[in-house]
Amino acid sequence: MQQLMTLLSPPLSHSSLLPTVTTKFGSPRLVTTCMGHAGRKNIKDKVVLITGTTGTGKSRLSVDLATRFFPAEIINSDKMQIYKGFEIVTNLIPLHEQGGVPHHLLGQFHPQDGELTPAEFRSLATLSISKLISSKKLPIVVGGSNSFNHALLAERFDPDIDPFSPGSSLSTICSDLRYKCCILWVDVLEPVLFQHLCNRVDQMIESGLVEQLAELYDPVVDSGRRLGVRKTIGVEEFDRYFRVYPKEMDKGIWDLARKAAYEETVKGMKERTCRLVKKQKEKIMKLIRGGWEIKRLDATAAIMAELNQSTAKGEGKNGREIWEKHIVDESVEIVKKFLLEV
């Protein structure tokens, strides 16, 4: 990832003036003014972080907030979504869903650039935050890669220590943060989320997932040394499938063995996605135990309504209406209060 670091330049000084915030809910204009580090040592620049496991709606919420707290821009902290060219594989938020909000470190690097380390992400994201704050814009960081989130926000960061490695102690989590943070955790109860994720895999396949995975397939790549985008769920599973059934065989008739192998591959991808949820949630809980103040938002009802494609709990509301009421409105109030704090 050496070539990525050439994008870095000396960090900008923080003006530390956060944006004038307007909302669509008729609230008065909110102004939060903070002096820079040189003016008052106890005042830190403000950053909003949206975290959570895969498939909970983090990207959607980041756009919802950015369009209500203008001017705001979004910084991606998903380690797979930094890559371009494989938008279905990495489940990158499509342009038409970005709401016209500028996104940083999203679909920016080629897979051949290598793997971005937490230390490199810290440098790149810090530069983006500095530029936004100096332009009086609110930085909204969004992503479920907890190693990136910890690296970016921790006041004390050791690139040689992985605080989420098996057996690592709680003391490896730095509770002192570099910024004054409002951290929102979008959560969904596992049985509902697992069904949603399985459906999402099916939708990704319909959108061309297998074709993109075929482009990534390289028979000479050591399966034990996966780096960068090749760590994305689905790559390993379909690599095994493509070794037996190369893509050029698609025009032929699928026998029972091939159909069974394909179905087993898709099943393995779904199961691995659900296991990832458990790992991500464990890391979030470790951050909380380590002293991070994280506000949980329960999006279960909204996701369940989307699954049912009808009503939730007899209220006659669709998933988007429930999302607006229980996630967006609550988040707006939390962020408004956060921006008013000195």
From Swiss-Prot:
Which reaction does this enzyme catalyse, per its entry? dimethylallyl diphosphate + ADP = N(6)-(dimethylallyl)adenosine 5'-diphosphate + diphosphate; dimethylallyl diphosphate + ATP = N(6)-(dimethylallyl)adenosine 5'-triphosphate + diphosphate
Keywords from the named record:
ATP-binding, Chloroplast, Cytokinin biosynthesis, Nucleotide-binding, Plastid, Transferase, Transit peptide
Residue sites binding ATP per the record: G52, T53, T54, G55, T56, G57, K58, S59
SUPFAM superfamilies hit by this protein: P-loop containing nucleoside triphosphate hydrolases
Gene of this entry = IPT6
Q: Does the keyword Thylakoid apply?
A: no
Q: Can you name this protein?
A: Adenylate isopentenyltransferase 6, chloroplastic
Q: What else is known?
A: Due to a nucleotide deletion that would cause a frameshift, IPT6 seems to be a pseudogene in cv. Wassilewskija.
Is Cytoplasm included in the keywords of this UniProt record?
no
- Expressing tissues: Expressed in siliques, at the mRNA level.
Gene3D superfamilies cross-referenced by the UniProt entry: Crystal structure of tRNA isopentenylpyrophosphate transferase (bh2366) domain, P-loop containing nucleotide triphosphate hydrolases
Among the GO molecular function terms of this UniProt record, one is:
ATP binding
- Tell me its EC number(s), please: 2.5.1.112
Q: Which GO terms describe its cellular component?
A: chloroplast
Subcellular location per UniProt equals: Plastid, Chloroplast
Give the range of the organelle targeting sequence: 1-33
> What is the protein's species of origin?
Arabidopsis thaliana
Lineage, broadest ranks: Eukaryota, Viridiplantae, Streptophyta, Embryophyta, Tracheophyta
The protein's predominant localisation is plastid
The UniProt similarity line reads:
Belongs to the IPP transferase family.
Q: What residues form the membrane-spanning segments?
A: none
Reported function = Involved in cytokinin biosynthesis. Catalyzes the transfer of an isopentenyl group from dimethylallyl diphosphate (DMAPP) to ATP and ADP.
- Superkingdom is Eukaryota
Q: Which GO terms describe its biological process?
A: cytokinin biosynthetic process
